[in-house]
């Protein structure tokens, strides 16, 4: 089945199968692939493992088989650390490709996926032989989708995820220029990659082909591409985001369980993982990743999500090979995006979990975000996975602080008996355990 996000390059189409991902190549694209396969990059672990299938079906000149990635994610879900790593990965591959007489024609972060902390470049069709006199055509794309979002976070402490979700083309040079102050002009890279870029784009917007011809006539050299890529790499490598944590960023310090309850909660999760033996776990509202790490230590691959960019970034820096940390607000989750709403999929369409963890989550969504309990449990049931869910009683201090900010009576249905009735209508309850003198309850349930 053709991937509905693979249509922009007619000579290079991707098809998904249960066991692998396949790529059909035109005759021209097949020649470029074989140039890559004959280079020193052929078995590079940074590039998705690929082999050519013996017999390509019509109309393709060649058919490639790619190793599957555990879970597909998108740049508008990544924390700063992952986007920075993806940018550095692409620049390193660009430089290494140039050494081999190749170049990357694209520079979109969507060409990078994650196997835990390890970045994997998945678009082998982006490699082509370098032609003398040509510039790096991916430069603008790199700026809009990788450099500018990183600058926005590092220089202005503005989250880039909504920008990338709002436009699959990223942030235009003129848009970023208008967000920068006079003082920002003097930052490293600002003049060349933002202000000059915006000016030149305005001047040559309708003359792309003419500019390419002029560069070739002027004797544009590969060394200039290399020099620009190296400078970009130095700029990206030096960027750091020091954004302040949102309200729940220090959850473990602010709302810590006593030692006994913490051990019992960890034991409950550990037991659930052993009972279910999941391959894929979703840890919703993962915070510092305590329970993600428990599941990963028992062989599961964990997609750990939280709305707090700060804690997700902190988890990404730990570089756990079995945990993919994503910035996801479950009350405003990433929708299907792009052409016909099919280029980028929502979370559940990318592969549902075998086990879902929803710990210290329900009260936030029900009280803070005003999500109706029946609908929240309907959504969890729709994942069709085993579920570990925690209910925090209205009498608990955690819930009391949230309820204090709400109109009296607004959440009258937020009650343990109501929750258990709704839960029992959708799931079979396998095990429960009370913590904090009954003010917090853990449930292991399976879909009916």
What are these regions (language model features)?
Residues 103, 108-154:
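Catalytic activation segment of kinase domains across protein kinase-like and atypical kinase folds
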Residues 277-287:
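Conserved class I S-adenosyl-L-methionine
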Residues 288-300:
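Conserved SAM-binding loop of SAM-dependent methyltransferases across substrates and taxa
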Residues 301-306:
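Conserved SAM-binding motif I beta-strand of class I
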Residues 316-350:
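S-adenosyl-L-methionine
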Residues 357:
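A conserved beta-strand element that flanks and buttresses the S-adenosyl-L-methionine
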Residues 364-380:
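A short, conserved alpha-helix within the catalytic core of class I
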Residues 379-394:
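Conserved beta-strand signature within the Rossmann-like core of class I S-adenosyl-L-methionine
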